[in-house]
């Protein structure tokens, strides 16, 4: 048995020329140095890229320009997929190729594409030399009618039409394919390869049909391009806008074909395939309807997809190469899984934080070069990136929703060794080739097994070694038992689909079991602080510049960690100072609060005391007023009781007055306008204050009952009821008011004025109208119906009969009817008045007759 040949690494992206096309010509010296270093460099690689025979690329019948480009890129001997697929692809057959990630599939279809262009160019040159020997006037006329590209092809022998179309599922893969082809075609003269992807224009202009409008830069780059690389959406736009000719295509290559044929891309791929078939209808030499060679490459092919893919192929010339259909994982990858038990929570932020803590422990334990961490959610990826950067790890994040320029910049930083960790969604789970990545961590479990193999395939590239760790969630035993009961119940109800959706904990652990059973994967469980042997992932870096870059990144990380510690200490000191100041402020505030509290309570106490004092003061004054009122009442009673006259006094109750009023009102219902309480037709005031200075006969309907207050209705508060003084020895008290010719018998109707006269309601004045009203209201007195003069005569006669003091009337006036009563009268009752004038010698009650 022949010795196995160890192959060189297939990573043209390591050179400085891989990042930018413009730098390719300036990096020839670096490539030559790298080539010389590589000749003396050898390292152990895995068996899945080894072949038994000692075969080189020169034995694969390749053009010398391609061979020279492969040699400069470090490719001396082919891998198994390269050895089998390149010769078949060059021969022109349709090809379905399956190989493990990182075994050199990009080199396979890159070489096949270059060979196709070189072959067509060679045929064109032969045809051009033949045309030169047969030039005629007719051919000269045809040359004038040719377009620019056809004229150049005919006269110079250079193809300026698209020959190869390469479709990739993501923009990052498309850019990488273009870089690989550029690196191995630098010795191929007049071959142009361009990549067309979306997201680079600052203004995403669209037409009325919501289709992308190509800018002039894309159109200019299409001129003279033989190999076109792009994403499905961009390729469709080029064809729709009639910028990409499909009638000249000779070959269509689908990288990551299983991804291109899933639901997200299948509609666009079918549209492109139909457009290519219509453009080549005149070359119908295959069952597929076109003369185009179809090639498909991927690391994984589901069983149903193979039959679907054959519909795009020429079945007569179809060849399948499936080198890893049973075990798609690479031999150089050591696979681990770590369980996170959700005893109380389920896929929440707490579980995410626990995973982040375990992740940091892994990064500290494993001496990795570069690492890729996959997340299922963009938000989690962004949060993880922030945490790792705070820990000092040079980390970047990439996802589909980002700006395309930022995505390209992030990939450039990863490939140029400017970062150590890249956090990503499934955007870069396929096709991305970075040799220095020797650690892959699945923070979240992928959705299917194919994605799992593509994720871990980012390490262990082309026979190198690496480690993959997958974090899975597992529910507690109690939750498992509950789910088992639910599962049995759902099976009885034939709801297996709902059971699969609700049983996330079992899905993740079953995912690992299926990897072991169906794909024979060697995967080991681990826990925190488990040591991962260095020989499982460590290897010597091929490029000396990588060693220096790694050392710089580690130094930067240490500086960042030191800076973070200093910032934390500074922050702690600031927090202590702030806490100290805060405590002092709180103490001051507390003192102020206590001070205000004491003042407030003191003020409240003072207010309460003031209220009590006011209350006592009011009560004291109220008592004094009551005592004063009581004293006045007692004085009044004393005056009544000590009267020197022999007449008897009594108080007539209000009921007597009310009875009298009732009797009067019932007999005078027709004359009740402007009547007082006792039926008197008046508009005057009851003035009982001798000091009232008003006009005679003034009327305001006010009752002045206190001798010391003007213009107020105040009856003395000490008097109880209306006092009536009756002379029992005199028959002057009549049973009815209008039977009394002397109205002074009713005290309540007295009117006192300040002009030495009094006025009675029933004898108002000498006005005839008032006399008539009084005569009409008196039902019992028929003699008073004439006029006021007759009433006055009667009063004079009655008064003369009872006159016992003629001297008094001579002193105060000769009017016996009270019209000239002096101003000094203070109080009167019935037939008596009390005089306080200095001319009165008795100063006592005097009978008024």
UniProtKB/Swiss-Prot annotation:
Which segments constitute the Helicase ATP-binding domain?
86-319
List compositional bias (Low complexity) regions by residue number: 667-687, 696-720
The protein's enzyme class: hydrolase
According to its record, what are the GO cellular component terms? nucleus; SMN complex
Q: Report the residue ranges where the short sequence motif DEAD box is annotated in this entry.
A: 255-258
| Catalytic function, reaction form | ATP + H2O = ADP + phosphate + H(+)
Q: Where are the annotated coiled coils located?
A: none
PANTHER family, sorted: ATP-DEPENDENT RNA HELICASE DBP3
Q: What is this protein called?
A: Probable ATP-dependent RNA helicase ddx20
What is the protein's species of origin? Answer: Dictyostelium discoideum
